């Protein structure tokens, strides 16, 4: 909306096409692009997506879902001083990682903008120590008054004036927010909490893997174990990928039991990967 008020030109495509989008950016001297992670990953597969080919581009903003660190680093390498990441909920909570943030903070999703507040709390609503994992809660000037005709959902989401996100994260000593996972996506293996995102960051570092989604599946001994659905850049022995990942995880309960290939991930309208759909399809198949 601010861009529209300033009279900016909007360039729209009928459907997303990586090569076509690059051509459109070049032909129209596009300065700002707002993309979801799955689109950025596809663009990074094209060597023409860099500052030399698209010199007009001043900002690449990723929204809708977390972008893996591996892809952030590649994007920053190709498009220096152009990367921004927005994390937030429509209900009224957000953080921004801007292009001037230190490289050491690239794994984060930034800090709250002015007038916004953020806390990390335990299940009882108490603040947790710096760098410890808890639920992300926040408030700010655009906090919603509630869900339409759903006082039950409103009471669950807003407690004591703070919006509970349902996301797990941690704040570092400088106030930068690091996303861990959705509470509902957490895997419990052998009684231990396992966060899919931690494993995904390892899997996507494999040279043959373009993208990954990890979810929990039933296991007769541990209750659940991690399963990795991958989109590949090239053919590879999946057992080799599984062993490669399991040599690098920090703990036994993070070891991946199964790796399998999909052409693409199911996503919602915001571009977020639907792990629950993947899990259901996997269990049915």
Enumerate the predicted regions with their spans.
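Adenylate-forming AMP-binding core of the ANL superfamily, especially NRPS adenylation
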Residues: 66, 104-149, 157
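Short proline/glycine- and acidic-rich turn/helix-capping motifs at secondary-structure junctions
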Residues: 259-270
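AMP-binding/adenylate-forming catalytic core of the ANL superfamily
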Residues: 25, 33-36, 88, 140, ...
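Alpha-helix capping/helix-boundary segments
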Residues: 17, 39-40, 67, 143
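Glycine-centered tight turns that cap/initiate beta-strands
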Residues: 48, 56, 81, 115, ...
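Hydrophobic alpha-helical segments, especially N-terminal targeting/anchoring helices
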Residues: 121-122, 165, 171, 267
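ATP-dependent adenylate-forming carboxylate-activation enzymes
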Residues: 8-28, 37-39, 194-199
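Gly/Ser/Thr-rich phosphate-binding loop
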Residues: 1, 5-8, 27-35, 44-105, ...
């Amino acid at each position: 909306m601010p861009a529209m008020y300033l009279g900016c030109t909007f360039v729209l495509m009928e459907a997303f096409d990586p090569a076509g989008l690059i051509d459109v950016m070049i032909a129209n001297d596009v300065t700002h692009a707002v993309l979801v992670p799955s689109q950025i990953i596809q663009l990074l597969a094209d060597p023409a997506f860099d500052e030399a080919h698209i010199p007009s581009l001043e900002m690449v903003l990723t929204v809708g879902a977390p972008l893996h660190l591996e892809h952030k680093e590649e994007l920053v390498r190709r498009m220096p001083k152009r990367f921004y990441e927005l994390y937030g909920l429509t209900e009224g909570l957000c953080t921004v990682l801007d292009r001037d943030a230190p490289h050491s903070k690239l794994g984060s999703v930034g800090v709250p903008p002015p007038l916004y507040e953020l806390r990390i709390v335990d299940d009882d609503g108490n603040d947790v120590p710096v760098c410890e994992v808890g639920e992300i809660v926040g408030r700010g000037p655009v906090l919603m008054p509630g869900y339409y005709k759903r006082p039950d959902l409103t009471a669950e989401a807003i407690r004591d004036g703070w919006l509970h996100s349902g996301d797990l994260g941690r704040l570092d000593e400088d106030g930068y927010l690091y996303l861990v996972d959705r509470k509902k996506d957490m895997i419990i293996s052998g009684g231990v909490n396992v966060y899919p995102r931690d494993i995904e960051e390892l899997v996507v570092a494999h040279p043959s893997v373009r993208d990954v989604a990890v979810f929990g599946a039933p296991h007769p001994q541990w209750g659940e174990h991690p399963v990795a659905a991958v989109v590949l850049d090239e053919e590879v022995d999946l057992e080799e990928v599984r062993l490669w990942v399991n040599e690098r995880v920090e703990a036994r309960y993070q070891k991946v039991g199964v790796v399998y290939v999909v052409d693409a991930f199911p996503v919602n309208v915001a571009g977020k990967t639907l792990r629950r759909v993947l899990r259901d399809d996997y269990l049915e198949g």
